[in-house]
A protein has these predicted regions:
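Cleavable N-terminal export/targeting peptides
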Residues: 1-24
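Transmembrane beta-strand segments that form the barrel wall of outer-membrane beta-barrel proteins
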Residues: 27-35, 57-68, 89-101, 124-136, ...
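Outer-membrane beta-barrel "beta-signal"
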Residues: 154, 189, 195, 216-228
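Detector for outer-membrane/organellar transmembrane beta-barrel domains
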Residues: 106-174
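Outer-membrane beta-barrel initiation region
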Residues: 20-54
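Residues that define the transmembrane beta-barrel architecture of outer-membrane proteins
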Residues: 23, 43-47, 72-76, 109-113, ...
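Outer membrane beta-barrel transmembrane domains
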Residues: 162-197
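Short loop/turn motifs that connect adjacent beta-strands in outer-membrane beta-barrel proteins
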Residues: 19-24, 86, 154-164, 192-205, ...
Length: 228
């Protein structure tokens, strides 16, 4: 799996000649009423900063989540990704604060390494994610599950708002998603309104609903984003 992902990344980099040749950077932060990820609640009110750079379709970004509740786990993720004409592939290192950051020992680390591949058709995007190393969940045999998740997202515009409809599911058993087999874990609808301040500052505000049929949960989400 590792060799396949690295081969895809190297091949993608070699075909990037026609992409933008300027280095870009992103700094931003989301403020969310509760931290919902792939249909699972991972925290309450949280700040979620991000920092990234990109060059010729290749990007390296960091993302974190810090909850206001002392019981919420702190999270720090790094993602290396490549995108070309709708196709995208990436590697993400997830880390949660229950363990030491520089502990990479097998069966001890709290890092999770995930690979993803997807395609954006414009009117619809599809993504597949698979854990390939680290603190992965277990299958029904008690072995590494290579926990996976796939997602379909459809953006549209209605009533002067930008909407996204999301369908996400887990294809097979894993304790990471509390799944005994194929199950739907994420059905979401979200609307975003971009407020423009003094004709140059943007303040997107979003709200929506996320349902997790597997867990029989329904969440309301609300937040805002800041970026420069």
């Amino acid at each position: 799996m590792k060799r396949l992902i690295m081969t895809l990344l190297l091949a993608a980099c070699m075909t990037a000649a026609g992409a933008k040749d300027k280095v870009g950077a992103t700094i931003g932060c989301d403020f969310v009423g509760q931290y919902i990820w792939r249909g699972q609640k991972l925290g309450n009110v949280s700040l979620q900063p991000t920092l990234g750079i990109d060059y010729k379709g290749i990007s390296l970004s960091s993302w974190g989540s810090v909850g206001f509740d002392s019981d919420d786990a702190k999270e720090l993720d790094f993602t290396l990704a490549y995108e070309l004409k709708g196709f995208n592939v990436g590697l993400t290192d997830y880390w949660f604060s229950e363990g030491n950051y520089f502990n990479y020992k097998a069966h001890q680390t709290t890092h999770v390494w995930e690979a993803n591949v997807g395609y954006d058709f414009g009117f619809l995007s599809v993504q597949w994610f698979t854990n390939f190393a680290g603190n992965d969940g277990l299958n029904r045999s008690g072995k590494r599950a290579y926990s996976s998740y796939f997602e379909i997202v459809a953006p549209f515009r209605l009533a002067k708002l930008d909407w996204t409809a999301t369908f996400g599911a887990v294809p097979y058993a894993t304790t990471s998603y509390d799944a005994n087999g194929f199950c739907v874990t994420n059905i979401s609808l979200r609307a975003t309104k971009d407020f423009i301040i003094k004709q140059k500052w943007h303040l997107p505000v979003f709200a929506g609903l996320t349902g997790n049929p597997r867990a029989e949960k329904l969440y309301i989400i609300f937040g805002t984003s800041f970026s420069i």
